[in-house]
Amino acid sequence: MTIGVGGKTKEAALSALSDMTAGIRPITKQEYSTRIGKAQEVMQSHGIAAIWIHAGTNLTYFTGTIWHPSERMVGAFLPAEGAIEYIAPYFEQNTLRDYMVIEANVNVWHEHESPYRLFVETLARIGIPGEKTSPPRIGLSEDTPFFIVDGIAQLTAGLQLVNAKPVTAHCRTRKSASEIALMQRAKDMTIEVHKAAASILAEGITTTEVNTFIHEAHKKVGASGSYFCIVLFGEATAFPHGVKNPQTLKRNDMVLIDTGCQVEGYISDITRSYVFGEPNERQRKVWDAEKTAQAAAFKAAQLGVPCREVDLAARHSLVASGFGPEYSLPGLPHRTGHGIGMDIHEWPYLVGSDDTPLAEGMCFSNEPMICVPGEFGVRLEDHFHMTAAGPVWFTTPSKSIDDPFGLAR
């Protein structure tokens, strides 16, 4: 039997877990202010007069204000010079103030009024009026819904609307030490949950049961539960993001579990693949090829190297092991990795079309999955962050198919 897989009851596995949140340090108000200052520097270098930061991750990142987007327009203006200005429905203004970390004026609109007109009026009031001859450039955060962009566009003949991604992505891709510490804690928590989940596997258990256990295990280590969870058995493991129907575990099935949690808004996302029982020669070959490809991608991830080269290194490794080429199956049907932070998938991406040079503070998943349709799939997903000395793993990669969690002594 694979080491660490099976042998415990759900109750025993949960009781062995404990809260891991001691000493967590949230992002400070000073750091939010620093982020705003950095964004303003980037705006000035790009000739952008102001950016609209829509409710959601970007608003939280720059202001600390947690507000989920809806059909009602909520967000903040950040001018290239000066203080931020919020926009919100009149009836939400006090709630918004309660959630503020960076406090500022709130411009309000009643339900029968146009928030898009308020958008234009607020810009004019803070010294950015529309000009037809030389329209100021106004960036809209890339997560702003189209219906809001369209509503604004109908009223902004004297403004040039542009994508604010050069500002938002530039600031968010390179994490601070405090961000990396929060991500490290989230990943440490999820690794312990992975070990616990592996220990409860038994013939006849369903993917639904394991999913429920993982949610409770994440709570036990101090998270609010799983941020997401994919549990797959047998042939279903060849589907990167799963199948519709639950599966029941059988002896010698491949198991794939991909899950994560949030700590102060920062996300973990870790996948483990192993066999419930004794690996056969085919399973062992694919698993070893996956581990080799993951290691090749990590080795290629050096400062200044374009993201695409990391993806290419994984694909070259897989071809050498008899898989692919490119996106062909059996092989790797998707990119090698993605950036991660407050969003589970964010820039930059380890994919053939991304020329972004790797830089200190960037954080990535490394998951060059091998899919063998009709048989099984293997995905080993760990994350790394770039330092002045090169890449550093957040979590130790799986040791072997026989001892995926490195438990043997």
Kindly label every feature range from the protein language model.
Residues 1-409:
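Active-site neighborhoods and metal-handling regions in enzymes and metal-associated proteins
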